[in-house]
From Swiss-Prot:
GO CC term (a single one): SCAR complex
Protein family per UniProt: Belongs to the SCAR/WAVE family.
Subunit structure: Binds BRK1. Interacts with SPK1, ABI1, ABI2, ABI3 and ABI4.
Domain note: Activates the Arp2/3 complex and binds actin through the C-terminal VCA (verprolin homology/cofilin homology/acidic) domain consisting of a WH2 domain followed by an Arp2/3-binding acidic motif (A), separated by a conserved linker region (C). Binds BRK1 through the N-terminal Scar homology domain (SHD).
Region Disordered: start-end pairs: 167-198, 351-382, 802-827
Record lineage: Eukaryota, Viridiplantae, Streptophyta, Embryophyta, Tracheophyta
Matches recorded under PANTHER family: PROTEIN SCAR3 (PTHR12902:SF33), WASP-1 (PTHR12902)
GO-annotated molecular function: actin binding
Protein name in UniProt: Protein SCAR3
Organism, as annotated: Arabidopsis thaliana
């Protein structure tokens, strides 16, 4: 408190008074001092309020908490005494070792906290008290038409934000869709204008051909000029537009083509027309004839009548000249008349020229009747050879590169509507699989077979050259056979392989060609030559700009019905991969029986090198592709199958399905055994598969069965266990080789011990390795020296650590090898097989010392000539466990008997070398065996006599008893030190004394058994 309280106020209060009036001066001074005191008290009050802020609240809370704590403490005091009484009343505490206290202590469940109150601390509660309230949305209610409280309700309602977010996402999707539509429309417009300029410049190209006029059904098309140099560049784009045209127009050009077929009379037949399903890779089809501009406009202007649709469904076969008429009629309705004139010329040339597929599609050559003269056939022959030469000359034109990368991107933009495109393709496949047989007049119409195979010409140019050579010979042979009217078989072998290098696995393509030459003279005298090509497996990882699409589109309805009736589904027996076991029966593959028996097929299997072994996905991928049949399947044609009528061509199915089915079946049989169902694959019964190139013969069946067996015995499955286990299918299990389970009862005289024994060291990484619990005798306490346990307790030097340090046994794998026939074995042999060997030290040769009498009645096991640190053998088992040994164990007994004899000879030489050994023997040994021991021995001898009367034991049995039974006497105490040898080597003397004493016991047992009760001992 400041001394001058008057200075805290203004001095004018008392200075401005009248100096002559002292009373007024004193009053002013008093008021000034009072004001200063009051101001100072106010400051003190504020300071005290800051210091003692909330102290009263804290005091009240502390008092309340202390009261609650006192109540809880009373509860604890009432609960603890019963627990303490129960704890002190327990006699054993062994059960505490089996409680999960180690895991319980770190995670103490807090059910009720006795020391801390439920309220949060003030340091946590203060931020909640000091935070601001909700936003003052009520200020916006005056701008809302719903009245007061509407803004708070609106902005706190979760549905409002849900609706707002959904509207925003819908707006974004609509904007993106409109943008993509505009971009696609722009690309289509530019592509159409570019194609119009391409078609306009067709006549100015270098590779031009002039074709003669062609007459069919009274209609003649004029001579045109066209070029095929630029077809490969635009092939992908034209094929796409043809598909889109088909999907938009309903059924595609099949409907319009059916009109010409229905107008064709039954008796009429085209003259000198060869039908080809596909041309060279650079050639054009009916889809390429229709330009993109016409395709875009035709779906808006062209309408199909219902009668035409019905005719399309009813008709099953049309020819290229009929398509020419329809295409010409369509071209007249459009604005691009000049382009369509050139397109019609291309179709006319297709009708005039005898074309064929160069290893890509299916080709049908339909010859005329036998009434046609040889000149006409010779013309066809020369025309076919000329066509081959023209195709050879046009190889370089075909191999021209594509336009640019921008064009490829624009083509990729056209595949936006993928779902509709796929649906239209499936409809076209169903619509194009048509064939018709005119059985009324015996006239076979031309069958339409369309196979579209788009491949990169740069990669497969060599296949075109090989195809030309092989087809050149094919044309010559076919026409030569026609002239000579013979049924000579035509063999065509075409190898086409397209290797795509992947990151982890190799992908293979296989092209199979099954050439069937069916020479049959029917009532009309007509010859039919059929060549059917099945495309190879589709590579699934190629770019979309390089579509390798193989469609086999010709199927005969009758052949399909016959083959579907004979085909059996694939059958697989499996246990679902339970515990890694193999199926009880191997996978059985049912081969189709509807194919021609004359066809022979080569099947080659290319095994893939496994990629990184630590990647399970790569292993599964390799397993699924391991069984793909590679290279070529060469089918030798023969006479027609008698089961097929009217010379119908055998149906072709897409080869991709057969390859996927075979790889799926073998892959599933492989994956059932390794990692379960890792990959979703279609089963065989879910697919309609008619593998036309795989005949049913013994070679194929044997080959496939060999593949199946080879994969079942795969090296990755059971290599470590083929030689050890009786079967190849051993389940895997966690490594338990370090575990030892032992059971030692403490209250039994002859305790049994169960040990966990493994078969061998190869089962380290198995999940469930096989093991056996083998009985062993337990050891009693080493300080028990009573006469009752003299012959049943083990050596005092024996301990559990010695069991661990022991080599488990010499025959560690014998019980494992004999586990298959162990049902007839007895429990005693398990005991015997695990007590065949003892530990051998490097310093001294330790082996049991055995003595065998002349009568071969008793053999016992003596202790080691070893230092006390080495373990001694366990006590002998009960008499009922002593059985004869197996032949394998008898061979080991012979070797160990020789060691016993050498050890015995060594011991007696040591004993004879001692000068006073026999004289001081009574003084060295404390006492002879007591009568109780002798009585016990006599009882044992009596039991042995009874067992000997029942069955005469063999020599190996006695040697086994030497190893298994042991008479442990009391420890020998040295009582004299007069012998120099005993002083220098007390250990040997102690051992020799023990040996002699035990030998005396043996002598007594043998003498009592033989009837000789003399106590004299002879070394012989």
């Amino acid at each position: 408190m400041p001394r001058n309280v008057y200075g805290m106020n203004q001095s004018e209060v008392y200075r401005n008074v009248d100096r002559e009036d002292p009373k007024a001066i004193l009053n002013g001074v008093a008021v000034t001092g009072l004001v200063g005191v009051l101001r100072q008290l106010g400051d003190l009050a504020e300071f005290a309020a800051e210091i003692f802020h909330g102290i009263q609240e804290e005091v009240m809370a502390t008092a309340s908490r202390s009261n609650q704590l006192k109540i809880r403490l009373q509860h604890i005091e009432a609960t603890v005494p019963p627990l303490e009484k129960a704890m002190l009343a327990q006699t054993t505490h062994i059960h505490f070792a089996y409680t999960g206290g180690l895991e319980w202590h770190p995670r103490i469940p807090i059910t009720q906290n006795h020391l801390i109150y439920d309220d949060l601390p003030h340091i946590i509660m203060d931020p909640y008290e000091e935070c601001r309230g909700p936003p003052r949305l009520h200020l916006l209610d005056k701008f809302d038409i719903n009245g007061p409280g509407s803004c708070l309700k609106r902005y706190s309602d979760p549905t409002y934000f849900r609706r707002a977010s959904s509207n925003l996402s819908q707006g974004n999707k609509k904007f993106q869709k409109d943008k993509k539509h505009c971009k696609m429309k722009k690309k289509k417009t530019s592509s159409r204008s570019r194609d119009m300029s391409r078609l306009a410049s067709l006549a100015n190209q270098n590779a031009r051909k002039t074709f003669a006029s062609f007459s069919f059904s009274g209609q003649t098309s004029s001579t045109k000029t066209t070029s095929t140099s630029d077809m490969e560049k635009r092939y992908d784009f034209q094929d796409h537009h043809s598909r889109s045209f088909e999907s938009r127009s309903g059924s595609g050009y099949n409907e319009c083509l059916s009109t010409a077929t229905s107008s064709l009379k039954t008796g009429e037949r085209p003259k000198g027309v060869f039908v080809s399903s596909s041309l060279t890779p650079g050639s054009c089809t009916i889809a390429s004839v229709l330009s993109e501009c016409e395709t875009e406009d035709a779906h808006d202007n062209f309408q199909f009548s219902p009668s035409q649709g019905q005719a399309a469904r009813g008709s099953s076969c049309v020819s290229w000249d009929e398509k020419a008429e329809i295409v010409e009629s369509l071209g007249l309705q459009t604005d691009e008349a000049s382009e369509m004139v050139e397109a019609n010329s291309v179709v006319d040339t297709l009708d005039e020229k005898p074309s064929y597929g160069e290893g890509i599609g299916g080709v049908d050559f339909h010859s005329k009747d036998n009434e046609n003269d040889k000149s006409e056939s010779g013309l066809r022959k020369r025309a076919g050879i000329d066509e081959v030469r023209e195709i050879k000359n046009g190889r370089e034109i075909v191999g021209e590169p594509r336009d640019s990368e921008q064009e490829t991107e624009s083509e990729g933009e056209c595949f936006v509507d993928a779902l509709n495109t796929i649906e239209s393709e499936s409809e076209n496949n169903q619509g194009l699989q048509t064939s018709q047989v005119s059985s009324s007049c015996g006239v076979a119409d031309e069958r339409l077979e369309k196979s579209v195979c788009e491949q990169e010409t740069e990669q497969n140019s060599y296949s075109v050259e090989d195809s030309c050579r092989s087809m050149d010979g094919l044309m010559a042979n076919s026409f030569k056979n026609e002239e000579n009217a013979s049924s000579e078989n035509v063999s065509v072998e075409m190898h086409q392989q397209n290797l795509q290098a992947g990151s982890d696995i190799n992908r293979l393509q296989k092209n199979d060609l099954c050439a069937n030459k069916d020479m049959r003279n029917d009532s009309g005298g007509k010859d039919t030559i059929t060549f059917t090509f099945v495309p190879g497996l589709e590579n699934s990882l190629v770019d979309s700009s390089n579509p390798l699409i193989h469609h086999g589109l010709q199927e005969n309805q009758e052949t399909e019905a016959e083959s579907s009736g004979d085909l059996e589904a694939f059958k697989i027996w499996t246990n679902g991969g339970l515990l890694g076991l193999k199926p009880s029966k191997p996978p059985v593959l049912a081969m189709p029986s509807s194919l021609s028996p004359d066809c022979k097929t080569e099947e080659r299997t290319v095994g893939f090198a496994e990629a990184e072994k630590d990647k399970a996905d790569d292993l599964v991928e390799n397993a699924s592709h391991r069984h793909v049949l590679n290279n070529s399947s060469l089918a030798t044609p023969g006479t027609q199958n008698p089961g097929s009528s009217n010379g119908i061509v055998m149906g072709i199915v897409d080869q991709r399905e057969s390859h996927e089915t075979s790889s799926g079946v073998f892959g599933l049989s492989h994956k059932f055994l390794t990692s379960g169902f890792r990959r979703k694959d279609s089963f065989a019964h879910d697919r309609k598969t008619v593998p036309a190139t795989i005949p049913e013969n013994d070679e194929v069946t044997t080959e496939r069965r060999r593949f199946c067996d080879q994969d079942i015995n795969e090296k990755t499955f059971m290599d470590p266990f083929r030689d050890e286990a009786p079967i190849d299918w051993i389940t895997s299990s966690p490594p338990l080789q370090h575990m030892k389970i032992s059971l030692n009862p403490a209250d039994t005289l002859q305790a049994s011990r169960l040990k966990l024994k493994f078969s061998d060291g190869d089962n380290t990484y198995n999940t469930f390795s096989s093991f056996q619990l083998l009985p062993e005798t337990g050891t009693s306490l080493p300080d028990s020296y009573s006469d009752d346990d003299t012959f049943c307790r083990s050596s005092p030097y024996m301990s559990d650590t010695d069991y661990l340090s022991d080599n488990h046994s010499l025959s560690n794998s014998e019980p494992w090898e004999e586990s298959s026939d162990s049902h007839g074995r007895k429990e005693q042999e398990l005991y015997d097989s695990f007590h065949e060997s003892r530990h051998v030290d490097n310093n001294a040769e330790a082996s049991p010392l055995g003595i065998k009498s002349e009568s071969s009645c008793v053999a016992v096991n003596l202790s080691y000539l070893q230092n006390p640190a080495e373990p001694l053998p366990p006590p002998f088992p009960p008499m009922q466990w002593m059985v004869s040994k197996t032949p394998s164990e008898k061979m080991e007994d012979k070797t160990q008997s020789l060691q016993l004899q050498e050890a015995l000879r060594f011991a007696f030489e040591k004993h004879i070398s001692l000068p006073t050994a026999k004289n001081e023997l009574p003084s060295m040994v404390t006492s002879a065996p007591k009568p109780e021991i002798k009585a016990h021995l006599k009882n044992n001898v009596r039991e042995e006599k009874q067992s000997a009367n029942a069955k005469e034991t063999e020599t190996g049995d006695f040697l086994q008893q030497i190893r298994t039974q042991q008479f442990n006497l009391r420890p020998v105490v040295m009582t004299t030190t007069s012998s120099a040898t005993a002083t220098t080597d007390p250990i040997i003397n102690t051992k020799i004394s023990a040996i002699l004493e035990k030998a005396n016991s043996i002598r007594q047992a043998v003498a009592s058994k033989d009837g000789d009760e003399s106590d004299t001992w002879s070394d012989t």
